[in-house]
Design a protein with these regions (language model features):
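Hydrophobic helical h-region of N-terminal Sec-dependent signal peptides
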Residues: 11-17
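Extracytoplasmic electrostatic interaction patches
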Residues: 131, 135-193
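Mature soluble binding/inhibitory domains
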Residues: 42, 47, 51-81, 90-93, ...
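Intrinsically disordered, low-complexity, compositionally biased regions/tails
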Residues: 22-25, 54, 61, 68, ...
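Bacterial Sec-dependent N-terminal signal peptides
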Residues: 2-6, 18-51, 176-193
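Predominantly extracellular/secreted and cell-surface proteins with exposed
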Residues: 68-156
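Edge/loop elements at the starts and ends of beta-strands within beta-rich repeat scaffolds
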Residues: 45, 118-127, 164-170
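Hydrophobic lipid-interacting interfaces of membrane-associated proteins
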Residues: 57-59, 92-98, 134, 177-182
C-alpha cells in the first residue's frame, strides 16, 4: 500500500511539474522576439509634417525691384514627409485684392502642390525646387468685375521654390511666371505650425 501511495504522489508531482513547464513554455512563446510587431521607421523629415498657418505676401519683381501687390492671412500650407530627404508642399487657393497703382485689381490662383521637394535636414530644414507644373490663375483688370473674368490654365508654369522649416516655423518663397507674363510673381509665406 505504501508503494501505491508513493507512486500516486510521484505521478501527481510529475503532472504538476509537466503542467507548470507547459505553462512556462506557452508564456515564453507569447513574448518571444519572433512574435513582436516590427516598428515603422520614422523619417527624418517627419518632424516637418503638418499644417502651417501663414501670411502670404504677393509681389512682382521687375527690373531688379520688387513691388508689393497685396497679402492674405491664414493661408494653410500642408507639409508631408515623403522620404528621409523629400517632402511635399500643398498650397491653398488664394484670392488677393491688389494694392497700389497696378493695372489689375485682384489676383487669384487655384490650389497646387509641389512634390518631391528635396530637403537638407541640418537642424534647419532647407529646401529648394525648380519645376514646371500646371497652374490656374485669374488676374482681374482694374475696371472689371472679378466674377466676369475666367480662370486661365497654364500647363507648364515654371515654379521656383525655396524655404526653411525650423521647429514650428516655416518660411517659403515661390516664384512663378505663368504664360507670357513679362515678370515673375513672387509669393512669400511666413507662419507657424
Amino acid at each position: 500500500m505504501k508503494n501505491h501511495k508513493f507512486h500516486a504522489s510521484l505521478l501527481l508531482a510529475a503532472t504538476l511539474l509537466g503542467t507548470s513547464g507547459l505553462m512556462a513554455s506557452c508564456n515564453d512563446d507569447e513574448t518571444s522576439n519572433t512574435h513582436k510587431v516590427p516598428q515603422a521607421k520614422v523619417l527624418r523629415t517627419a518632424v516637418a509634417s503638418g499644417v502651417y498657418t501663414t501670411t502670404q505676401g504677393l509681389s512682382i519683381d521687375m527690373f531688379g525691384l520688387s513691388a508689393k501687390l497685396g497679402q492674405q492671412e491664414n493661408q494653410k500650407i500642408e507639409v508631408k514627409a515623403l522620404t528621409d530627404s523629400t517632402i511635399s508642399l500643398h498650397f491653398p487657393a488664394y484670392d488677393v485684392p491688389l494694392v497700389g497703382d497696378f493695372p489689375y485689381s485682384n489676383a487669384a490662383q487655384k490650389e497646387y502642390q509641389l512634390d518631391k521637394v528635396v530637403v537638407q535636414p541640418d537642424g534647419t530644414m532647407s529646401f529648394a525646387s525648380k519645376v514646371k507644373i500646371e497652374t490656374v490663375f485669374q488676374m482681374t483688370p482694374a475696371k472689371m468685375k472679378k466674377d466676369d473674368i475666367p480662370y486661365r490654365t497654364f500647363p507648364d508654369t515654371p515654379i521656383s521654390c525655396e524655404g526653411t522649416i525650423k521647429g514650428k516655423e516655416i518660411n517659403v518663397k515661390i516664384t512663378a511666371q505663368p504664360g507670357k507674363m513679362p515678370f515673375p510673381v513672387t509669393y512669400n509665406y511666413a507662419g507657424k505650425k
